[in-house]
Design a protein with these regions (language model features):
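Amphipathic alpha-helical packing segments from all-alpha helical-bundle domains
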Residues: 72-112
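Hydrophobic alpha-helical connector segments
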Residues: 18, 34-68, 124-127
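C-terminal peripheral helix-coil segments that are non-catalytic and often amphipathic
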Residues: 100, 104-116, 125-175
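C-terminal regulatory/oligomerization modules of transcriptional regulators
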Residues: 62-63, 68-83, 138, 174-175
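A short secondary-structure junction motif
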Residues: 2, 26, 30, 55, ...
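Helix-turn-helix
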Residues: 1-14
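Amphipathic alpha-helical segments enriched in hydrophobic/aromatic and basic residues
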Residues: 12, 16-23
Length: 175
């Protein structure tokens, strides 16, 4: 029941933070599993893009959590976890650490691909947010994406790959 939840969380926002953090930790775990035997940084980045841009199905081997439902919650409510007046205090309490850890993991792949790229962490966080935004648009606001005939995650993957590799392969301009 809702009353029972408040034994563990002081309010709904804290519950949302817990769920969002669980999701980002799970995504990092998935990324580690998918890339542990991959040697090339380009393939690791492509794997990260694929994991972030494709829909999540529930894994019946994990009865304690419904991954598809968790993904849907993060897609529709996740931004509310940090778009608050107390974001600095929450950050100081390390409530966004799982998201930062996932960004750092992907930033490592970016640095390995192009050690001279100046903004690996920014590109990594942008890639994550863009993957979620594009997936959300595909599901709920299809005119924002101008998809061909059907909802196609491959379009999102191609777009993200062009954006990410285009940014990393573009020569840096000096001031």
């Amino acid at each position: 029941t809702e009353a029972g939840i408040y034994r563990y969380f002081e309010n709904k926002h804290r519950l949302l933070l817990y769920l969002v953090d669980w999701y980002w930790s799970w995504q990092e775990y998935r990324l580690l599993q998918e890339t542990k035997n991959v040697t090339g940084p380009k393939t690791k980045i492509q794997t990260a893009i694929r994991l972030l841009a494709t829909k999540v199905e529930d894994d019946i081997s994990t009865g304690h959590i419904n991954e598809k439902l968790l993904h849907n919650i993060v897609m529709s409510e996740g931004a509310k976890s940090w778009l608050t007046k107390h974001v600095e205090a929450d950050n100081k309490d390390k409530l966004f650490q799982p998201f930062k850890d996932l960004c750092a993991r992907i930033a490592e792949f970016i640095k390995a691909y192009n050690p001279k790229y100046a903004f690996p962490f920014s590109l990594s966080s942008t890639m994550i947010e863009m993957a979620h935004s594009q997936h959300f648009y595909m599901q709920h606001l299809p005119s924002m994406k101008k998809l061909k005939k059907k909802k196609n995650e491959e379009d999102i993957i191609r777009f993200l790959e062009q954006m990410v590799f285009g940014a990393m392969d573009c020569p840096a301009k000096s001031k």
